Amino acid sequence: MAKVNLYISNDAYEKINAIIEKRRQEGAREKDVSFSATASMLLELGLRVYEAQMERKESAFNQAEFNKLLLECVVKTQSTVAKILGIESLSPHVSGNPKFEYSNMVEDIREKVSVEMERFFPKNDDE
């Protein structure tokens, strides 16, 4: 095991001591919660977080490109469904039934979407 001397801020020192004190209060043994062991554990954890962030940066996933593609597919689907609804509303099998008139179908869809959106994105009083 390598030995390293380093300087840390007073804030970091106090936070490490707080972790040690908390573990001791929880019943940990003195040798298991030394300053050296705790600082080493935090350093290793920090290195893993750093490596994970670097891997994410190198990944081929591009959030902006994904969002663009997703929006494009949603718009295509919306346009296609609107055309299908228009065609369906002209069908002789449903003619005269107000439930299947295009404007009524559109309004019904908007109401249902509004209810579902409200579940996930409640309106604020500010809006």
Swiss-Prot record:
GO cellular component: cytoplasm
Keywords annotated in UniProt: Conjugation, Cytoplasm, DNA-binding, Plasmid, Transcription, Transcription regulation
Compartments reported by the entry: Cytoplasm
GO molecular function: DNA binding
UniProt xrefs under InterPro entries: IHF-like_DNA-bd_dom_sf (IPR010992), TraM_DNA-bd (IPR042073), TRelaxosome_TraM (IPR007925)
Stated family: Belongs to the relaxosome TraM family.
Function of the protein: Conjugative DNA transfer (CDT) is the unidirectional transfer of ssDNA plasmid from a donor to a recipient cell. It is the central mechanism by which antibiotic resistance and virulence factors are propagated in bacterial populations. Part of the relaxosome, which facilitates a site- and strand-specific cut in the origin of transfer by TraI, at the nic site. Probably autoregulates its own expression. Plasmid specificity is conferred by the TraD-TraM pair.
Known partners and oligomeric status: Homotetramer. 2 homotetramers cooperatively bind to DNA although they do not contact each other; cooperativity is achieved by DNA kinking and unwinding. Part of the relaxosome, a complex composed of plasmid encoded TraI, TraM, TraY and host-encoded IHF which binds to the F plasmid origin of transfer (oriT) in a site- and sequence-specific manner. Interacts with TraD. Also interacts with TraY.
The protein, known as: Relaxosome protein TraM
